[in-house]
Amino acid sequence: MAAQKKQGERVLPARSTRKRRQLPDMLYYDERTDSYVTPQERSLSEANAQTRPAPNTINQAVDAKQSAREARVQELMKSKLYHLRKQQKQARHKRDQWAIDYLEWKKNEDEDVWNSDAEATGPAEHTSSFLDALRFSQQFMKAE
């Protein structure tokens, strides 16, 4: 369907000619295989899913899925990346530990402040009572 062109008119294409960004083939998570699959494999697995498996095969599939997951976890534990992340985490903890300790200490310091409502005697009263005790004991020192 070619557009009719009048004199001095530009013919614009029906669709933009700008180069389109090619989207990558997305991977979809497939619950049945417990893995990531391409769209073609996904449509195949959906077609296979239309036929219902027997109950005992479901249990076998669950067991297989579980063992596959455990194997992957073991792989991850052994992998270098896991250990690198673990070391980074420990280093971060060591680096920030002083701040955590300081906050704990500061909190305790703030709690130690004398509360005049809760206590009948404060630092000044303690000092004066100590001086009174000294004076009292001096009487006996003189007597001896």
From Swiss-Prot:
Source organism superkingdom: Eukaryota
Gene Ontology annotations of biological process type: DNA repair; DNA replication-dependent chromatin assembly; transcription initiation-coupled chromatin remodeling
UniProt keyword list: Chromatin regulator, DNA damage, DNA repair, Nucleus, Transcription, Transcription regulation
Subcellular location: Nucleus
GO CC entries: Ino80 complex; nucleus
Start-end of Polar residues biased regions: 35-58
Segments of this protein annotated with the region Disordered: 1-58
Major localization listed first in the record, in broad terms: nucleus
Summary of the function given for this chain in its UniProt record: Component of the INO80 complex which remodels chromatin by shifting nucleosomes and is involved in DNA repair.
Quaternary structure annotation from Swiss-Prot or TrEMBL: Component of the INO80 chromatin remodeling complex.
Descriptive protein name: INO80 complex subunit 5
Gene transcribed to yield this protein: iec5
